[in-house]
Amino acid sequence: MAVSRRRVPQAGARSFFCALLLSFSQFTGSDGTGGDAAAPGAAGTQAELPHRRFEYKYSFKGPHLVQSDGTVPFWAHAGNAIPSADQIRIAPSLKSQRGSVWTKAKAAFENWEVEVTFRVTGRGRIGADGLAIWYTENQGLDGPVFGSADTWNGVGIFFDSFDNDGKKNNPAIVVIGNNGQINYDHQNDGATQALASCQRDFRNKPYPVRAKITYYQKTLTVMINNGFTPDKNDYEFCAKVENMVIPTQGHFGISAATGGLADDHDVLSFLTFQLTEPGKEPPTAEKDISEKEKEKYQEEFEHFQQELDKKKEEFQKGHPDLQGQPADDIFESIGDRELRQVFEGQNRIHLEIKQLNRQLDMILDEQRRYVSSLTEEISRRGAGTPGQPGQVSQQELDTVVKSQQEILRQVNEVKNSMSETVRLVSGIQHPGSAGVYETTQHFMDIKEHLHVVKRDIDSLAQRSMPSNEKPKCPDLPPFPSCLSTIHFVIFVVVQTVLFVGYIMYRTQQEAAAKKFF
């Protein structure tokens, strides 16, 4: 690998585009079309995308979110939830608060997708407790599980911000299913019940965090926009659960709770879409809207249209100088058109590379699950009684594990190369005076500096070892002579005699001194 890396700067732009084409070819089929990692249940080509239909009765979005009586149309809120014109504060930043909002009507969608935009903000570095997005058979208006009821029948996607088990794996996003008979393991953050999870920090972000949850062909996929950029479509893969069975009819909901620590949990929008598989006839909106509602909506539309026409006339009367703008200002120039086309092309390349990055994340997640399952199988068989004729299957499992690890390594290398490609494309999107020649010259300078450092190290090594002679240890100093036994005994006897004589002399002096008193 070291040889190929030194040749990359010399190849210049040609090697870069060859690597880009090779990376694209690894993830395309025989017909030249690639899969869509962001699409729900993407197993085919991009042409086989499901039909999306917006369901307004299972959605809310600001502005003008609440009615005059403080309620949200088609939704019911409970607990400490506070609806406002632009958002719904599910749980305020006070201790021991919990609230929730739920759809009033049950949804009977075979496949669906929800897009939730929310903010979790707090003053401290650690927050609590978190927020949950639900699809359950019944409404859980109040309860101990992030403000909702326990033993639910359905699925919950938990945005857990507090580390209850002390494993330092929070904030985390956890997918937990329930059949209505299991109590949530709150002390361990549901680690033993999690179907899938990922670690993402969703607190105190500069932009709202977005979650896209897709249930398509019995596969639940969670995509996250971490809120670092204003791009609404900048999603990354988080979790995926296959062969998941949920109730055919259920309520959508979102809940939140606080504990000793408290965050503000605000939901800006909750958009629901019904998905229809390709080849099937999409549902028509006329079947759901009655004639009275149609007439009512038509009257409202005509009323708003008349008000708009009046506002236009008033604006034109108040601003006569803005009428009759030159036609040249309306159309773009040739330079503007060319610049727009260049940026659009570069943006498409950037989006394709990000799509490949998402697909690599999904492949890595699947490979990790396969490796973990095989490792558990190996450990379970290894814990059995020895001497059984199962060594052949053990070797096969070891071979499969090694091959899976090799695949993971190769996928990581491809991902790293794609990240480098994204960096180079980002550099191309900012054109300046530096070209391909200057970039190549920069790499050549780095290579030359590395050679100089290596030469200096070699010279230092040769200078420290001028010959092949082995290093000798220094000679030991002369051992000091010890005192003999006779001298030691004489010294002790003399010292004892002197001590006894001193005691006797002192006693006589004290006795003589007492005669004078």
Curated annotation (Swiss-Prot):
An annotated Gene Ontology molecular function:
metal ion binding
Question: Where do we find the motif ER export motif here?
Answer: 516-517
User: According to UniProt, where does the site described as Required for ER export lie?
Assistant: Q508
* Summary of subunit composition and partner proteins: Exists both as a covalent disulfide-linked homohexamer, and a complex of three disulfide-linked dimers non-covalently kept together. Interacts with MCFD2. May interact with TMEM115. Interacts with RAB3GAP1 and RAB3GAP2. Interacts with UBXN6. Interacts with SERPINA1/alpha1-antitrypsin. Interacts with BET1.
Lumenal compartment segments: 31-484
Signal sequence extent: 1-30
Q: Which InterPro entries match?
A: ConA-like_dom_sf (IPR013320), Intracellular_Lectin-GPT (IPR051136), Lectin_leg (IPR005052)
Transmembrane regions: 485-505
Protein name stated in the entry? Protein ERGIC-53
Q: Which residues carry this modification: Phosphoserine?
A: S433
From which domain of life does this come? Eukaryota
Annotated segments matching region Mediates interaction with RAB3GAP1, RAB3GAP2 and UBXN6: 506-517
Name of the gene this protein is made from: Lman1
What topology in the membrane does the UniProt record assign?
Single-pass type I membrane protein; Single-pass membrane protein
What processes does the entry annotate via GO biological process terms? endoplasmic reticulum organization; endoplasmic reticulum to Golgi vesicle-mediated transport; gene expression; Golgi organization; in utero embryonic development; positive regulation of organelle organization; protein transport
PROSITE patterns named among the record's database cross-references: L_LECTIN_LIKE
